[in-house]
Every structure is written in structure tokens, then in C-alpha cells.
Amino acid sequence: MTKIALTIAGSDSGGGAGIQADLKTFAMHRIHGASAITCVTAQNTVGVSQVAGMDISLVKAQIKAVADDLEVNAIKTGMLLNSEIIAAVAQQIEQYRWRQLVVDPVMVSRSGVQL
């Protein structure tokens, strides 16, 4: 049976970090990757030019959609952007009783930009 991991993080338009990197990593380990996007960044290998947070109701809806359909074996968090998103994600992790959790507190981009 294929293991399922849910990444809850930001989307990197350059593909080198965030949700995109997590999904590539899961695939390399033959783990099915699901995702909930917390924010979208305009970034590339040079830097980050813009960050936009997702509406909390949409973040929660993404997590619920995955939880209602897939048997999630592990959670990985990345850029959660603000305290409201952090609280909403924490509440849902508790609600679904997910215990296999990797927390990657992303606060600064690889290029040094504070997120």
C-alpha cells in the first residue's frame, strides 16, 4: 500500500522550494504527495519579489478535502506565513489526530529574503 504524505506549505514559482520541492521529495521515496497551499510566492533562483497568503478558509478547505478522501500517514509543514494560518493548521492537525509530523519553520528564503 502506498504511503501518503500531506505537505502544508507555500508554493514556489521557481520550483526549488515549498510545495514543489516537497512533492518531488515524496515522489523520490515512492510516497504519494498531497498538498495544501498556504501562500504563493513570486520567486526564482535570484530572489523573492512577492508573497501572497491564501485565505484561511481555503487553507482549511484544502486540508479537509485531502483528509476526507485520503488516509494521510504523515504531515510536513513549511511556510505557514502568519499566526492565523499557524493556528488553523494546528487545529486541523489536532482534529484529524495526525501524529507523524515534520515541522520545517520556513521564515527566510534561500536568497535571504525574510518571508
Regions found by a protein language model. Give the residues of each.
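Small-residue (G/A/S/T)-rich helix-start motifs and N-terminal tracts that mark the onset
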Residues: 1-74
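Conserved beta-alpha-beta core of the PfkB/ribokinase-like small-molecule kinase fold
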Residues: 74-77, 81-115
